[in-house]
Amino acid sequence: MGNNQSQGQGDKGEKKDQPKYQPPPPPTQFGKKKKRRGAETSTKLPVITPHSKCKLKQLKLERIKDYLLMEQEFLQNYDLNQPKVDENSKEQADEKIIEELRGDPLTVGNLEEIIDDNHAIVSSTVGPEHYVRIMSFVDKSKLYLGATVLLNNKTLSVVGVIDGEVDPMVNVMKVEKAPTESYSDIGGLEAQVQEMKEAIELPLTHPELYEEIGIKPPKGVILYGEPGTGKTLLAKAVANQTSATFLRVVGSELIQKYLGDGPKLVRELFRVADECAPSIVFIDEIDAVGTKRYDSQSGGEREIQRTMLELLNQLDGFDARTDVKVIMATNRIETLDPALIRPGRIDRKIEFPLPDIKTKRKIFEIHTAKMNLSEDVNLEEFVMSKDDLSGADIKAICTESGLLALRERRMRVTHTDFKKAKEKVLYRKTAGAPEGLYM
């Protein structure tokens, strides 16, 4: 019995040595476990169990290694099959994005004021001024007051700058191809040709001659005389002989419809001439814009006077233009404003009179050099005539005589054809013209 008691006490001691039972911790979340998606779960390797070293763990690790090798091979093949992206294609993609941001069509406006790097005040032709944003891809070094900018059609944000913009009318005035006329095509006018060379051609080709002698070359010349005496022809010959840029404009083109467009066109004309220096600006029929000033209530007359004032400013402004020469031509120099043709602006006035006997003979020889003339043609009869014939009249007589020969199916021009042509030209000039046209 005692043994039983001692055995019972030993069992109680063993129970005291065992740890007490602890319940498991409560779950942190209730319900079904949510599946995680994203880059972490796709790149995370699976957990290998059991953790002890055994054959099963080795097989699982080898299987994971095979999957990783397959993934590596797939990525290598994918990179090889992808087209190579060079810098040009990247730039093209960026330009495409910029074009999408700009939108289409674009509105043209003027930059009135720059507030900061990202904002400006612009004005457009379709409305008032606007406070707009400047997009980040715009080259801000090209922005200046008065610049022509491109605006988004909806938000009117500045999305571009038109650099080096030139008035389309000024581009039309620029003579791209040199005229074919030369000094050999001018009959007579030796004194006029010499004066033109000294005033226009030599300062552009040999400016050092004027520096050595210590004088400033003339800024411009004016050619005046009756119609058809060779003023425009001499200007074309100068353009042919020099390699300078030749800008030709008629005086009536400087008269514009809207207020301020005429002076703006004059500024654009001389700005392009300055950029393309050495250059020659030929203004034909200058009397259309350079007439004498007088008090007038007409808005059109005041606009013409403003255009002439801008022309005066460009001729003798503060900016000295040594490589820009001005040639003017007119039939009525007495109607021009004295301020326009004073020395300092127009230093030489070259008169073109009606041709004398010697000049007439040269002009007839030039225009009949390539004509098939009959043996009975006597040009001295027309040269010695007392009729006031200009160079243009002589050219018209030669052309008309050839047309009369073609009318009769002849390939040679006779003396009779010249007589009929002369009578026809003189009739058109005097009796056939309105009274007072050539006064």
Curated annotation (Swiss-Prot):
GO molecular function annotation: ATP binding; ATP hydrolysis activity; proteasome-activating activity
Alphabetized PANTHER family for the sequence: 26S PROTEASOME REGULATORY SUBUNIT
Cellular component terms per the entry's GO annotation: nucleus; phagocytic vesicle; proteasome regulatory particle, base subcomplex
Pfam families: AAA, AAA_lid_3, Prot_ATP_ID_OB_C
UniProt name for this protein: 26S proteasome regulatory subunit 4 homolog
Subcellular localization, as worded in the UniProt entry: Cytoplasm; Nucleus
Role played: The 26S proteasome is involved in the ATP-dependent degradation of ubiquitinated proteins. The regulatory (or ATPase) complex confers ATP dependency and substrate specificity to the 26S complex. Plays an important role in regulating both growth and multicellular development.
Keywords attached to this entry: ATP-binding, Cytoplasm, Nucleotide-binding, Nucleus, Proteasome
Keyword Amino-acid biosynthesis belongs to the record: no
Family per similarity comment: Belongs to the AAA ATPase family.
Region (Disordered) location: 1-46
Principal subcellular localization: cytoplasm
Record: residues binding ATP: 225-232
Biological-process GO terms, alphabetical: mitotic cytokinesis; proteasome-mediated ubiquitin-dependent protein catabolic process; sorocarp development
InterPro entries found in the cross-reference section: 26S_Proteasome_ATPase, AAA+_ATPase, AAA_lid_3, ATPase_AAA_core, ATPase_AAA_CS, NA-bd_OB-fold, P-loop_NTPase, Prot_ATP_ID_OB_2nd
